[in-house]
Design a protein with these regions (language model features):
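Interhelical loop and helix-boundary elements at the membrane-water interface
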Residues: 2-37, 70-99, 119-150
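Residue-level signature of transmembrane alpha-helical entry/exit and packing/kink sites
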Residues: 17-18, 37, 54, 58, ...
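Short Lys/Arg-rich amphipathic alpha-helical segments
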Residues: 28-47, 57-61, 65, 76
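Membrane interface segments of multi-pass transport proteins and intramembrane proteases
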Residues: 47-60, 81, 128-138, 164
């Protein structure tokens, strides 16, 4: 059975669903991936905006969140009947947290990062779309957004290098 549009009841029925649906952001009737990406901002600020002297700790936390996402999206995708359901937005949350971790702590850079990330996540330039079609399950759900984050960071690095 395929659940076309999950409701709050589904999200709250299992902690795994709640995580995969980005703490409910994926229930947004309009652009759930964008809602999930926006969720990364308050989470980033809640955790101190990366203000740490331990970059390896930050990397470890992001790797842990990625692993949780693989697990949560795998199970939730099975329960929804679609392996990469649009309501699952934990992938956007984690990938954009990675972008925020490597983006200057400036609202203009973060806004640019947000729009670039959303563009790359939606457009899926090569090889993102090809890999998304080949790599299935929770890992595939999470991985294509990490690639979109990589494209975002590459463009930001080029802009910073060339213009600033």
């Amino acid at each position: 059975m395929i659940i076309a549009r999950p409701r709050a009841r589904f999200a709250f029925s299992d902690p795994v669903h709640f995580i995969a649906l980005g703490f409910g952001a994926g229930l947004s009737p309009f652009a759930p991936g964008t809602a999930g990406t926006l969720l990364a901002f308050p989470l980033w600020w809640l955790f101190g905006g990366g203000a740490t002297d331990e970059p390896l700790l930050l990397l470890a936390v992001l790797a842990f969140l990625f692993g949780v996402g693989v697990w949560a999206c795998e199970l939730t995708g099975r329960h929804l009947g679609v392996s990469d359901h649009g309501a699952m937005c934990w992938d956007e949350v984690v990938a954009f947290l990675l972008v925020l971790a490597l983006t200057p702590d400036d609202p203009w850079w973060q806004a640019a990062a947000f729009f670039l990330f959303r563009a790359f996540d939606v457009i899926k330039p090569p090889p993102i779309r090809q890999l998304e079609m080949r790599i299935k399950g929770g890992f595939g759900v999470m991985f294509d957004d990490i690639l979109a984050a990589g494209y975002t960071l590459l463009v930001l690095a080029i802009v910073k290098r060339v213009f600033f």
